[in-house]
Amino acid sequence: IVNAAVPPFGAWLPDAYPAATVTGAVFMSAFTTKTAVYALIRICAGSEILIVLGVVMAIYGVVYAVLENDARRLLAYHIISQVGYMVAGVGLGTQMAINGVVAHAFCHILYKSLLFMGTGSVLYMTGTAKLTELGGLYKTMPRTMIYTVIGGLSISSFPLFSGFVSKSMTVTA
């Protein structure tokens, strides 16, 4: 539960990502919360309390992400939200839901790593992760902008992107 960042036990997550190096943040994003989701699949798939916890996590993560000004903390709050989808899918416990959770975990590793690397390159080039201090970077960092937009569309479940497919599987279940 702690590793899955279930509120109130997930308070460590938004503080850990800004403190880590970019490569450390990518590694943590890829493995720490996903191992907890895997453990939940193995131990308590189909538990109704996980549905409630997953929905709470999804809402909690999005609300705090909207209020955040630091790019790395924003991505950390979105991890809580995305893992919330996965936890709710584990709680459903159907074959389709579990397949959707596994697909979403894999997709999440890909697009969240892309977003963290893009944020890391912006941090390296500008020296700040404050969103209010960034602007016009598409002129000086066009490739980073393209890759970050791809990651953003995927996390938003835009059609034809990986996040759309994996979240659709879980929602359909």
Short names for language-model regions:
Residues 1-173:
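Hydrophobic transmembrane alpha-helices and their helix-loop junctions in integral membrane proteins
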